[in-house]
Amino acid sequence: MTYSEIRKNEEVLTFIKKGNANLGAMGFTDHSEAHSGLVAERAAEILKKFGYPEKDIELVKIAGFMHDIGNAVNRSHHAEYGALLANDILKKTDLPLEDRVQIVSAIGLHDESTGGATDPISAALIIADKTDVRRSRVREKNKATFDKHDRVNYAVTDTKLKINVEKRVISLNLQIDPKICSMYEYFEILRQVTFTHKPASGVP
């Protein structure tokens, strides 16, 4: 089972679609196939830059694309639900047991409320997920009814992921429209998501 095959897997795509619909009905930002694909590619970029083997890069792409399928069941504990769903799907493939467990573990650990990085693959997935900040993720069209997460995403007009291998630093450069969200407000919301600062230690 490869990343390319997972991207075409009917079960995976159906779970992503339903999860995104559920979150849309609850007022959350976009969690569609676009988000899943971006997280997969960004997580792979992180591991590639740090010199991890192709096998790990392939596994993190699969985990990245599948990481939010648990939203089809419930937003609460979606990481754990997603891990169970992923295990069931991947059991039907030719993926070795050890690789399947690695993917399932990363998916189950990716949410800040219950998880945390335990290895390079889970760390790269968490970081990649948190760096998907973009205007196109906002579904609400009426700016007057934006919640804080809508404002943070809508305020971003451009993003660039920077990876400094020598200093072992990963940073996200953001271009922000101050008419939508002040710099203070932006960083105040980011401060609340303190979990984002923890996973880098999982990348040795």
Regions found by a protein language model. Name each.
Residues 1-78, 88:
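Acidic/His-rich, divalent-metal-binding segments that scaffold phosphate/diphosphate chemistry
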Residues 38, 81, 123:
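Charged catalytic carboxylate motif
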Residues 42, 84-85, 192-196:
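Long, highly charged amphipathic alpha-helices
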Residues 60, 64, 81, 107, ...:
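Short alpha-helical catalytic segment bearing the HExxH-like zincin motif
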Residues 77-87, 97-98:
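Post-HEXXH active-site segment of zinc metalloproteases
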Residues 96-158:
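Histidine/acidic-rich helix-loop-helix segments that form or flank divalent-metal centers
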Residues 135-204:
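Terminal helices and disordered tails flanking the catalytic cores of nucleotide-processing hydrolases
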